[in-house]
């Protein structure tokens, strides 16, 4: 079976968008990756060398750190290339490109694809931050939930859409309530940041119906359990070991969304 040229072009454009958007994430990932014990500061304002960081988007590189490492003042010749102060320069664009390409392939030419492509970089950013410091910052989780519902509103008014805004709203409320119940029952096992992220998950998955909500939720817990089990077997984790659950929530959401979009 050959891939139609239109679909191939759509996937290619989506992958390019993902790569470009992902290339802007390393600096934001560094700034938001504040450990829990330092959270009162909100976010990082300096690189590890103590130099101020300008802006939120772009590569995580510092020209002043490069000058210090080279031992050459900036006014003695050509400026040294800016030195990286955080990882992700390759991984984040690549991952975002793959995610966006997969979403385009599954969704096709539908209005909601624009929403998925706009939300995907934020999801990758959240996963990167949670993996680094096991924390999901409020400035990312809550606006993401609001953005999902706001953006899906116009999509529901356009022809050829394959979802429902009402179930997106109800999905956000239902999944948020479910995660809140888990948090109240076991605060040490389910962080409140996961509860806020669940609002976005429910909105995105709910667009394609309750079956997609259940599939994405199940996939998140399955992936998290498999990862935790693998760590336990390897002797790297015990019953009280805390793991970042946000990336598995996002991966489960992606899996459910791909299935929901493809079968819609």
Regions found by a protein language model. Name each.
Residues 1-264:
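A membrane-topology feature that recognizes alpha-helical transmembrane segments
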